[in-house]
UniProtKB/Swiss-Prot annotation:
Cell compartments where the protein resides: Cell membrane
Family designation: Belongs to the potassium channel family. S (TC 1.A.1.2) subfamily. Kv9.3/KCNS3 sub-subfamily.
Transmembrane segments: 183-204, 221-243, 255-275, 286-306, 322-343, 385-413
Protein name: Delayed-rectifier potassium channel regulatory subunit KCNS3
Function: Potassium channel regulatory subunit that modulates the delayed rectifier potassium channel activity of KCNB1 by namely slowing down the deactivation and inactivation time constants. While it does not form functional channel on its own, it can form functional heterotetrameric channels with KCNB1.
Tissue spec. comment: Expressed in myocytes. Detected in lung, spleen, brain and heart.
Lineage of the organism: Eukaryota, Metazoa, Chordata, Craniata, Vertebrata
Quaternary context: Heterotetramer with KCNB1. Does not form homomultimers.
Main location per the UniProt record: membrane
Annotated source species: Rattus norvegicus
Listed PANTHER family: POTASSIUM VOLTAGE-GATED CHANNEL SUBFAMILY S MEMBER 3, VOLTAGE-GATED POTASSIUM CHANNEL
Membrane topology designation: Multi-pass membrane protein
Gene name linked to the record: Kcns3
Cellular component GO terms, alphabetical: membrane; voltage-gated potassium channel complex
Amino acid sequence: MVFGEFFHRPGQDEELVNLNVGGFKQSVDQSTLLRFPHTRLGKLLTCHSEEAILELCDDYSVADKEYYFDRNPSLFRYVLNFYYTGKLHVMEELCVFSFCQEIEYWGINELFIDSCCSSRYQERKEESHEKDWDQKSNDVSTDSSFEESSLFEKELEKFDELRFGQLRKKIWIRMENPAYCLSAKLIAISSLSVVLASIVAMCVHSMSEFQNEDGEVDDPVLEGVEIACIAWFTGELAIRLVAAPSQKKFWKNPLNIIDFVSIIPFYATLAVDTKEEESEDIENMGKVVQILRLMRIFRILKLARHSVGLRSLGATLRHSYHEVGLLLLFLSVGISIFSVLIYSVEKDELASSLTSIPICWWWATISMTTVGYGDTHPVTLAGKIIASTCIICGILVVALPITIIFNKFSKYYQKQKDMDVDQCSEDPPEKCHELPYFNIRDVYAQQVHAFITSLSSIGIVVSDPDSTDASSVEDNEDAYNTASLENCTAK
């Protein structure tokens, strides 16, 4: 019994309600239950038909006027104590989710939990949520790794049905898995070196030494490096495309799309430069080509094929859109508020550069993100106070979702490393064939039958099997061995 059950004892003249919860029987007066009419037991007293009663309880005895509930009797003692005292207490040894489901069944809100148990209950609930999230993340990571490994095996199986399947499989494994063998590592290192060389050449080409009044000056060395890099990128993409087991899945891979986009500007520029006629359309096309040349920076994304960290970052952002959206929302609200505040106190100052709300947007953005270029800044005391508040709020707002995103990044990074380790095997995974089933008695009978047949073939036949003793069997075996030896000698 719970202590609260002794506070109230129904009188003889009061109408009682008989409750049976998992074998625990208790008689409670109606006035006690009607104190909380929105709970399950409170609604039970307002039912006017047996059908309505059975919707709220598991069974009902008309003769005994007893309501039966197939629930945990030990938990119901705390529910019953709630009706007597108006306060809900939490068991020490109880699972938080089980208790939460139980009070939800009885229609009791968590707000009725007493202050002595509320903080402990919320702490346990948060801990359980964190453990549950970690477990789900691990399960998803494990399931995803298993699915990707299974997909890798299925891709290998497709090569058996393709033309030049074995050759294409060897090429595909070496192009997709740098840790497969020494040649695959050399290909990966070469590809990484070409990507870096292309980025360096693009950056060097933008220096003042390679510029004039008309624009960029074509340097033979840099142009040769650019052509060599594009030739490598084109050949690499073509080899991947030819060796891929499925052309459709090949173009669904974001890394392959990046490879394709990285070579488009070069060929688009080459196509425009071959046009000799001059027209307005060609001039406009030239401007487009200049923009496309800037797209060469996307080649740096090719490093994701060789970087576990970049792939993990992409997976983290893809699965953290809710947290990223929340971060952008917080920043947008803060920028809007502080830009208006700083504009209202700085607009009349001649020495201030914060003369419009769009300029204040820029100032609030670099302030909340704690960048602080210093190109625009407040000059009044009120403006400096607002700026200090803006910076502090920016630190707090940015720090809240970053922790969640960082935890997800750590999990995806570890998952990606585990997958790379699994794919480092020297040989591709093979099918696990089932073991053949056989009966040992059948095998023994077949061996004996073969032995008897061989005896018959050399003229040793047992006339009466029942009269055969151990010595005769030994004689037959000696004769069989002698005959076999003679046959081998003759051969």
